[in-house]
A protein has these predicted regions:
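ABC ATPase "signature
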Residues: 217-218
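Catalytic Walker B motif of ABC-type/P-loop ATPase nucleotide-binding domains
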Residues: 159-163
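Conserved ABC ATPase "signature" region
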Residues: 100, 104, 112-130
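Helical segment within the ABC ATPase nucleotide-binding domain
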Residues: 173-185
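Conserved ABC transporter NBD signature motif
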Residues: 62-78
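Helix-to-loop junction immediately C-terminal to a conserved catalytic motif
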Residues: 55
Length: 242
């Protein structure tokens, strides 16, 4: 029996039952504890479909998805925090109000408990300088960091990040990467990215997707060896036919 926090077996997803095409087809995916698992693929490869299924946004057309032992959508959602490519935040609130609200809504009882959780999220995401600012006044980089802090306040075992570095400048991206590495000491992190170097530097394991299917998976070295290439970029090009 698989003991990984995230187990996806024989996953198929079709949005339109009248069409033959699947958004994802026969996908098997596993993400372990205290690790970073990356999804690589071009637009339309099926990455977002798989991530949203893992986060409990939709059922599989066929196959099974288990997150921390839960296979029903409510159970999955309780165990996953989803960080979208474009932050979805209440911009009328201050950062402080937003994070305390998220911590309280996530079942953290008592003001001391909420404070400890929020303090940790603020420290990891380096938000002290904007803690009292309104979300509406923040830059894209800070919005992404607040979105990540919000996911930390949910206290879930699994954090799913869809194209987290999109639109960030190199300095902001480097900071977010450090935060992800810190989180992975106690969490299961799953992320999608277009950037080969990002996956190579961050991920314990990578899955390369093309046309809704997994072309290859393993450590970076394993994927490179399997493809017969010299590096991950060459392996990606060969495996996806680009």
């Amino acid at each position: 029996m698989w003991t990984d926090p995230v187990v996806v077996e024989n996953f198929y997803k079709k949005y339109d039952p009248k069409k033959k095409e699947y958004a994802c087809e026969n996908v098997n995916f596993f993400a372990g504890s205290n690790s970073i698992t990356g999804l690589l693929g071009q637009n339309g490869a099926g990455k977002s479909t798989l991530l949203k299924a893992i986060a409990g946004f939709h059922y599989a057309t066929e196959g099974t998805i288990s997150v921390c032992g839960c296979t029903d959508l409510p159970g999955i959602r309780k165990n996953v925090a989803f960080v979208p490519e474009i932050p979805v935040l209440d911009r009328s609130l201050t950062v402080k109000e937003l994070l305390y609200l998220e911590a309280s809504l996530s079942g953290n009882e008592g003001s001391q408990s909420c404070r400890g959780i929020v303090d940790r999220a603020v420290e990891i995401c380096a938000l002290n300088e904007v803690f009292l600012e309104r979300v509406s006044k923040l830059s894209r980089g800070f919005l992404q960091r607040v979105s990540l802090a919000k996911s930390i306040c949910r206290k879930t075992q699994v954090i799913v990040m869809d194209e987290f570095s999109s639109g960030l400048d190199p300095v902001q991206n480097a900071l977010i990467r450090r935060q992800i590495v810190e989180l992975a000491k106690t969490k299961t992190i799953i992320l999608s990215t277009h950037h080969i170097e990002e996956a190579q530097n961050l991920c314990n394991k990578v899955y390369i997707m093309t046309k809704g299917m997994v072309a290859c998976n393993g450590t970076v070295d394993e994927v490179v060896s399997f493809s017969g290439c010299r590096n991950l970029e060459e392996a990606f090009i060969r495996l996806t036919g680009n």
